[in-house]
Amino acid sequence: MSLKRNIRRLDSIVPTAGREGSDIQFNLYKGRGVAVFTSGGDSQGMNGAVHSVVRMGIYLGCKVCFINEGYQGMVDGGDNIVEASWNSGSDIIQKGGTIIGSARCTDLRQREGRMKAAYNLIEKGITNLVVIGGDGSLIGANQFRKDWPGLVKELVDTKKITPEAAKSYPNIQIVGLVGSIDNDFCGTDMTIGTDSALQRIIESIDAVVATAQSHQRAFVVEVMGRHCGYLALVAALACEADFCFIPEWPPPVNWREILCKKLQEMRAEGQRLNIIVVAEDDDRDGTPISSDLVKDVVAKTLKYDTRVTVLGHVQRGGSPSAFDRLLGCRMGAEAVLALMEMNEESEPCVISIMVTRWYVPLMQCVERTKAVQKAMSEKDWELAVKLRGRSFQRNLETYKLLTKLRTVEKDNLSGGQNFNVAVMNVGAPAGGMNAAVRSFVRMAIVPSLYSLRYEDSFEGLANGAFKKFQWGDVTNWVMHGGSFLGTQKQLPNEKNVPLIAEQLRKHNIQALLLVGGFEAYHSTLILSKNREKYPEFCIPLCVIPCTISNNVPGTSISLGSDTAINEICTMIDKIKQSATGTKRRVFIIETMGGYCGYLATLSALASGADNAYIFEEKFTVEISLRRGSHRCKMAQGVQRYLIVRNEYANKNFTTEFVKQLFAEEGKGEFSTRINILGHAQQGGSPTPFDRNMGTKLAARALEYIITQIKESMVNGVVSTKSPERATLLGLTGRRVVFTPVEELAAETDFDKRLPCDQWWLKLRPLLRILAKHTSIYHTEAMEDTEDYD
């Protein structure tokens, strides 16, 4: 029987399913019009959405317009509403802010202002709007839509437009993209800009940690978020903060005593610094808890050298993260398609996306968002946390557990029993490995489990290189890349399997967690199949996929892949800058990934590359050159051409061969250069996404392992031969799923080390469209209502 356990979010907003797999033809909506504008506060990733709206709209045959300066530009009209060309979307995806400007507009709140806006849109022939902004911008758009028929009638009555024009524009259609660093809008997993803001926060805190350790200081870091504590909470998890203040879960009245006691305990454990994260506008019973107040409490009570760092608008700035670039691109494309398919009865919707995308009713999301604010104003904190969603709840629960210092006598998971659980890294190092190990260790210590580590993978295990973990052993592990345990690619084999079994028996290991890549998955499969011969392997085994290649079956995303894509995008941005100076140059960039083209495809899409050569999609010399798009780009626009090639895309068409091909083709017209990015792609400091995913997956893995240990216990001995006790913990869609590795074996190409089914291949048509290749595009829709947490 297949084992796929997951946690369902029963109270989630139910979306309307789209048309996954349907074909969208070139020039399908020729003659239609679309306008895009950004409103309210800016956020990183908005330009990616603008880039995608322009190019998808033009691909579909639409006339696409920019409305500069947000709603104010719509009211003022004139040169603020301009037609966009294909090149309008060039070289903007890596830029922060919004190239078309944004402004807060009071005129639109008045009927006279809305009348002017309606007139200007009719004059330009625009009735389809893509709104990129926060909840205020989206609510304003919905009100504008409701008033539209009356506004048009009044324009006819005052003879500002003709009755014929009124008949041509009887209604207006609106699709919203939520652009906000706060991530405070219900109905979408992540808003555009949130991931980038988290990266700015973590970069700042990581920098602060160095000086804090040097001087044994305490730092109070104030972050943005308005009335939402998402940024503060997730940042606290990602930087191992000692304390966190968020508006959804304010501390008790005696928070001063609790805070100081916690900081003293951490110093007593040998920690040289303390980090406290404070969300702006955090309050308890109407009394604000400011960063300065927290600083004064610590400094006066504990006499610690305490400093305040207010990050401010730094959080909005800088280049967007790869996640936000991809988010903007995919949302923008889907927004145009949604507009084209709307009719008079269609209500405004919001494009929501995580691994899949779907449409959710705008006002349903707005009402849910208002319900959170109402719960907080009524001091119903439990309801406020619940309404934020299961992901927010899980973040809060994990934070509470990981910041506990003292072991509780009895835990509801272990039932007060002591179990021996071990953890090891297998495969190549990747961002998030250390975060996963830290989380597993500390979550194990809380219920009084004995947590052991095996160093240097199976080589170390066979040689007995183990150590029992203590709480302080994993302090500050989250912020570091690589693997502190040491990791090797060696698989269990005939020589070392007996030694591995002996060590597991010697240390009475009752469960084993492997954090690593394809090798970790394959190793677990080998151990599982050797259970008949070695009873020491008849224990719960679990794998957390952690590899930059994202080539492990049973999961959509592997730990470390987000860090790698961000590193690749950063390097490509610098290469593009070089090309901007030299002009008329083709760059061929080689990425890692083995035979898996995930890194090449997603980094190409996130960096605005023109093509990506991968093993999964065959290419030839004729295909590479016949489009002639590289010649067109040299003659106009940015005058460069960028190709991302996966390292094993084709054994004959190597990176050097492709370079020589383009060099010969471009004699006298353009030059060609190659860049092999190498091991720099494994990244330095892990991204917040990888840190927190590793933290939460390891916590979930431990919960599941403890349950399996108790279910497999017979007369005090753990023994199980069930395939369902050797699992891989992965993300499929929006679900966290434990899948037996023996079941996954049927879905694996072991020769090429690839899953047989890879979701991201559906992004290939979008990559080609945005790079000006005529292609068929496949829309995606959510298949379920379950939530990754």
From Swiss-Prot:
The active site is at D182 (proton acceptor). It is an enzyme of class 2 (transferase). Coiled coil: none annotated. It comes from the Eukaryota. One of its GO terms (biological process) is canonical glycolysis. It catalyses: beta-D-fructose 6-phosphate + ATP = beta-D-fructose 1,6-bisphosphate + ADP + H(+). Beta-D-fructose 2,6-bisphosphate binds at residues 489, 547-551, 585, 592-594, 647, 673, 679-682, 753. InterPro entries: 6-Pfructokinase_euk (IPR009161), ATP_PFK (IPR022953), Phosphofructokinase_CS (IPR015912), Phosphofructokinase_dom (IPR000023), PKF_sf (IPR035966). Its cofactor is Mg(2+). Belongs to the phosphofructokinase type A (PFKA) family. ATP-dependent PFK group I subfamily. Eukaryotic two domain clade 'E' sub-subfamily. Homotetramer. This is ATP-dependent 6-phosphofructokinase. It comes from Haemonchus contortus.
